[in-house]
């Protein structure tokens, strides 16, 4: 594998892993290469992202590397997030949002377990729309990100606090979480909790 191919593989892994990032050890295991080789390629790739003409950077958080946007470009991303708040959410995003709203703080993997499918794209959508955010790190291997709702979530759904969320049925069946998410949003609509936009 050439250096460019190695860097392309690292870049792809960072992209796929998203906010959780990937540790150097995980990269070495995935790529089946030594720490020295992977770290040198990663550092050179990270240096290439420091170019002013790039919108992304590679950062290290809690011993995990991840792709993130450059802070100086935040005003553009905020405009984008605010404009996309007006458009509808997919069924997957609605399910994910309902799970996070009721079970926060919660990791992506825990959301995946409840839904029975991967939720990374839905979480990225909800994060970009400022409806959820990172609220901490779980204990344990990799210290996964914990997600919770934001003040924008409360505002968007006309809630003063999370205590105003409609109660879920006590006999909730996790295998039918899509139906439960529909029930959640129907209850919110019936209670006139949605803003008319």
UniProtKB/Swiss-Prot annotation:
Q: Which UniProt keywords apply?
A: Cell cycle, Cell division, Chromosome partition, Cytoplasm
User: A Gene Ontology CC term for this entry?
Assistant: cytoplasm
* Highest taxon in the source lineage: Bacteria
Q: What is said about its interaction partners and assembly? A: Homodimer. Homodimerization may be required to stabilize the binding of ScpA to the Smc head domains. Component of a cohesin-like complex composed of ScpA, ScpB and the Smc homodimer, in which ScpA and ScpB bind to the head domain of Smc. The presence of the three proteins is required for the association of the complex with DNA.
The UniProt function text for this chain reads:
Participates in chromosomal partition during cell division. May act via the formation of a condensin-like complex containing Smc and ScpA that pull DNA away from mid-cell into both cell halves.
InterPro entries recorded: ScpB_csome_segregation, WH-like_DNA-bd_sf, WH_DNA-bd_sf
| Name listed for the protein in its UniProt record | Segregation and condensation protein B
Where does this protein come from, organism-wise?
A: Halalkalibacterium halodurans (strain ATCC BAA-125 / DSM 18197 / FERM 7344 / JCM 9153 / C-125)
Instruction: Please name the HAMAP family in this protein's record.
Output: ScpB
- Compartments where found: Cytoplasm
Q: Which family does it belong to?
A: Belongs to the ScpB family.
GO biological process: any one?
cell division
């Amino acid at each position: 594998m050439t250096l460019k191919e190695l860097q392309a593989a690292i870049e792809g892994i960072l992209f796929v892993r998203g906010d959780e990032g990937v540790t150097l050890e995980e990269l070495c295991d995935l790529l089946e290469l030594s720490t020295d080789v992977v770290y040198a390629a990663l550092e050179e790739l990270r240096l290439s992202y420091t170019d002013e003409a790039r919108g992304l950077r590679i950062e290290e958080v809690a011993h995990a590397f991840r792709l993130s946007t450059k802070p100086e470009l935040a005003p553009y991303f905020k405009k984008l997030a605010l404009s996309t708040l007006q458009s509808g959410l997919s069924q997957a995003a609605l399910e994910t949002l309902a799970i996070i709203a009721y079970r926060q703080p919660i990791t992506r993997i825990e959301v995946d377990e409840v839904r029975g499918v991967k939720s990374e794209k839905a979480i990225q959508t909800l994060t970009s729309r400022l409806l959820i955010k990172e609220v901490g790190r779980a204990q344990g291997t990799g210290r996964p990100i914990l997600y919770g709702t934001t003040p924008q979530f409360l505002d968007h759904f006309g809630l003063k606090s999370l205590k105003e969320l409609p109660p879920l049925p006590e006999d909730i069946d996790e295998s039918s979480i899509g139906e439960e998410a529909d029930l959640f949003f129907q209850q919110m609509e019936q209670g006139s909790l949605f803003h008319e936009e």
